[in-house]
From Swiss-Prot:
It comes from Pyricularia oryzae (strain 70-15 / ATCC MYA-4617 / FGSC 8958) (Rice blast fungus). This is ATP-dependent RNA helicase FAL1. ATP-dependent RNA helicase involved in 40S ribosomal subunit biogenesis. Required for the processing and cleavage of 35S pre-rRNA at sites A0, A1, and A2, leading to mature 18S rRNA. SMART domains: DEXDc, HELICc. A motif (Q motif) lies at residues 27-55. SUPFAM superfamilies: P-loop containing nucleoside triphosphate hydrolases. The gene is FAL1. Belongs to the DEAD box helicase family. DDX48/FAL1 subfamily. ATP binds at residues 71-78. PROSITE patterns: DEAD_ATP_HELICASE, HELICASE_ATP_BIND_1, HELICASE_CTER, Q_MOTIF. It comes from the Eukaryota. It catalyses: ATP + H2O = ADP + phosphate + H(+).
Length: 401
């Protein structure tokens, strides 16, 4: 199913937007005055009508307005800016006209595939420019000419410095998952890229969470942005059941996880740890106990990560142990259970993690392992998202089945 084509409409009706006054709602894609070839791609991709964020943001972005769009996972955010980029580019000019920066390689690759699918009838060129891949291939593709580049900040900045990614025709910069991008790790690289862009470049910021420091940051490179925002207390996904299990000692988490495996009939599950070392340790422990699991983190070679993702997408592996590299926008339909073996060290990542389950209105369950040291973090998450996380009931298997 295409992202957004199975959006929970009932949940959407209850969603309250805090949005700039000039934003109008376009209830159909036809009413947005999009190119005929793009409309064909949208319908072929599985969309029938725009989601709440799409119906508000696409026309504003196509008008050339700097835009801050905030909507929860699974509401069609990726397609919002993909459709907008495809509308404004001129495919007769084989130069990069739109640039998307994402915090992870997987997300950048996924965006490329969405752009190519939506632009199927437009003869569009789109390249994923990401670290961990062959530089020579990047250079060849960029020298050939790409209308849209989706990439990670480091590799994109490198290709611009080497003058293979030509910036003079760029008219739109999209920062996807901006909260993560603008965290300290990527801030300087984004500034590096931004310095090379034409002064009139339109900036679009898209994210599920927009902490105040991120909004403050956007003032540096946005002019009078139009805002399309969901109130923060609406951000926890509808249809998700959130539980915690109180565990006395860190050492007992593993036994608790094994007990859960015995009682749950799981379609697909993701288990999150905070460090790469913990992912490797837990993967080894689970395999020693004869549980079949796969694992992924940022230290792995890109080819290996791609292969693991593909296996998981196709349902060949059922349980994936990962760090937050997986938590940002990766679109796997079947995930019905998320276990936070470690609570996220950054509370903004909580929604990205649990947003993995129950996408597009599917039921999903999130289970948080909580030691006495974690109680304060759990309460902080509850307050931040205005949500309630209950102790896990005995019949949790029935809720997932």
């Amino acid at each position: 199913m295409a992202e957004g084509s199975g959006i929970d409409r009932k949940a959407e009706e209850r969603m309250e937007f805090t949005t700039s006054k000039e934003v109008t709602v376009h209830p159909t894609f036809e009413s947005m005055a999009l190119k005929e070839s793009l409309l064909r791609g949208i319908y072929a991709y599985g969309y029938e009508s725009p989601s709440a964020v799409q119906s508000r943001a696409i026309v504003q972005v196509c008008k050339g307005r700097d835009t801050i769009a905030q909507a929860q996972s699974g509401t069609g955010k990726t397609a919002t800016f993909s459709i907008s980029m495809l509308q404004v580019i001129d495919t007769a000019v084989r130069e990069t006209q739109a640039l998307v920066l994402s915090p992870t390689r997987e997300l950048a690759t996924q965006i490329q595939s969405v752009v190519m699918a939506l632009g199927d009838y437009m003869n569009v060129q789109c390249h994923a420019c990401i670290g961990g891949t062959n530089v020579g291939e990047d250079i060849r593709k960029l020298d050939y000419g790409q209308h849209i580049v989706s990439g990670t900040p480091g590799r994109v900045a490198d290709m611009i410095r080497r003058r293979h990614l030509r910036t003079r025709h760029i008219k739109m910069l999209v920062l996807d998952e901006a909260d993560e991008l603008l965290n300290q790790g990527f801030r300087e690289q984004i500034y590096d890229v931004y310095r090379y862009l034409p002064p009139a470049t339109q900036v679009v910021v898209v994210s599920a969470t927009l902490p105040y420091d991120v909004l403050d940051m956007t003032t540096k490179f946005m002019t009078d942005p139009v805002r399309i925002l969901v109130k923060r207390d609406e951000l926890t996904l509808e249809g998700l059941k959130q539980y915690f299990i109180a565990i006395e000692k860190e050492d007992w988490k593993f036994d608790t996880l094994c007990d859960l495996y015995d009682t749950l009939t799981i379609t697909q599950a993701v288990i999150f740890c905070n460090t790469r070392r913990k992912v490797d340790w837990l993967t080894d422990k689970m395999r020693e106990a004869n549980f079949t699991v796969s694992s992924m983190h940022g230290d792995m070679p890109q080819k290996e990560r791609d292969s693991i993702m593909q296996d998981f997408r196709q349902g060949n592996s059922r349980v994936l142990i990962s760090t937050d590299v997986w938590a940002r926008g990766i679109d796997v339909q079947q995930v019905s259970l998320v276990i936070n073996y470690d609570l996220p060290s950054n509370r903004e990542n909580y929604i990205h993690r649990i947003g993995r389950s129950g996408r597009f209105g599917r039921k999903g369950v999130a289970i948080n392992f909580v030691t006495s040291e974690d109680v304060r973090i759990l309460r902080d998450i509850e307050l931040y998202y205005s949500t309630q996380i209950d102790e896990m009931p005995m019949n949790v298997a029935d809720l997932i089945a």
